[in-house]
Amino acid sequence: MDKFRVQGPTTLQGEVTISGAKNAALPILFAALLAEEPVEIQNVPKLKDVDTSMKLLSQLGAKVERNGSVHIDASQVNVFCAPYDLVKTMRASIWALGPLVARFGQGQVSLPGGCTIGARPVDLHITGLEQLGATIKLEEGYVKASVDGRLKGAHIVMDKVSVGATVTIMCAATLAEGTTIIENAAREPEIVDTANFLVALGAKISGQGTDRITIEGVEHLGGGIYRVLPDRIETGTFLVAAAISRGKIICRNAQPDTLDAVLAKLRDAGADIEVGEDWISLDMHGKRPKAVNVRTAPHPAFPTDMQAQFTLLNLVAEGTGFITETVFENRFMHVPELSRMGARAEIESNTVICHGVETLSGAQVMATDLRASASLVLAGCIAEGTTVVDRIYHIDRGYERIEDKLRALGAHIERVKGE
């Protein structure tokens, strides 16, 4: 397995171009199964999960090409089963189920894999599809969905806010008979982006970005061209990289209005931040950040996917900061690894108490999930000496060329090929 070797400490400064959002690109790729005509999707990041999704769409019979943009023609889809060998590495594959059953009346997806963060069950996806009239069976490790004729619109109240299940229900409802209302819907920018993509193909969706989404079913969706929004988590990660190294950065191709909660906390930490239409700049003026208190919650509150990065910020900041995780359990796996580098932290239930230290020391550490591993790489950039981050396949699932982008900011980082 590949590793990163990082030599520190460095002050990170310069410009970085933000990639398209993984968490919008994946649902949009699967939503393309609903279209009877070709679609072109621009600004799709080059990531392992994206490659896996494209492979899966090809196996289902779609024509998939990448030349800058991703081109998908799902008019000839004739296989309705997403097999275990592709699904096992990526839980996003569950998003194939809604479009398959909505357009073809049947779909099967192997129970998914991906990051091992707490309980992320597929029951909310299943309940939603059942409420739209699908029959669901769990057999031999597969979720099997079927319907006679078309799905039927329904008034669905989500038990809890779920990005994944909101996507599944919204996609399936676009081709259902009648109107579907999703109450307690997720409000994330990536949900809005997926809805806007579907609208570009002819879907009738309103209320995306609020907790009540209305979908009027149509008989079919056509083709179109759509550009995926910038990745707010990648943007936030690079802003934190500059903040903890007391540097300055400009993030290009960013979307500042998707990051309000993160920018507010960075300002609290002492960062000087400016925003334009598609850029964000951060300057620490050489100062050490101040500790901040953070509580994760669904959008528009502070995103759980930025929690590990802010844990690291607090661990090198002035003072003591509290980080409370309310979205996923078991999401502090980076804390013991950072402690190996000299960080001082205690975990109490779903809160990390971070006591800022002046410097971290390089160590051998292991990535456990996507965002935790990014925080370990950033820690290596500011630690004294050499840090080796193992199991970086997690990072490759969510960050496009992170080492090249960090190197352009002055980091001393190299990828060491595994045996």
UniProtKB/Swiss-Prot annotation:
Keyword Magnesium present in the record's keywords: the answer is: no
Q: What is its EC number?
A: 2.5.1.7
Main localization of the protein? cytoplasm
Q: What GO cellular-component annotations does this UniProt entry give? A: cytoplasm
SUPFAM superfamilies hit by this protein: EPT/RTPC-like
Location(s) in or outside the cell: Cytoplasm
Entries under Pfam families matching the protein? EPSP_synthase
Q: Which residues carry this modification: 2-(S-cysteinyl)pyruvic acid O-phosphothioketal?
A: 115
**Which cysteine residues pair off into disulfide bonds?**
none
Which amino acid positions bind UDP-N-acetyl-alpha-D-glucosamine, per UniProt? 91, 120-124, 160-163, 305, 327
> Into which EC class is this enzyme placed?
transferase
What one GO molecular function would you report for this record? UDP-N-acetylglucosamine 1-carboxyvinyltransferase activity
Per the record, the GO terms for biological process are:
cell division; cell wall organization; peptidoglycan biosynthetic process; regulation of cell shape; UDP-N-acetylgalactosamine biosynthetic process
Q: Does the keyword RNA-binding apply?
A: no
Q: Which domain of life is it from?
A: Bacteria
This chain's function reads: Cell wall formation. Adds enolpyruvyl to UDP-N-acetylglucosamine.
- This protein's name: UDP-N-acetylglucosamine 1-carboxyvinyltransferase
What gene does this protein come from?
murA
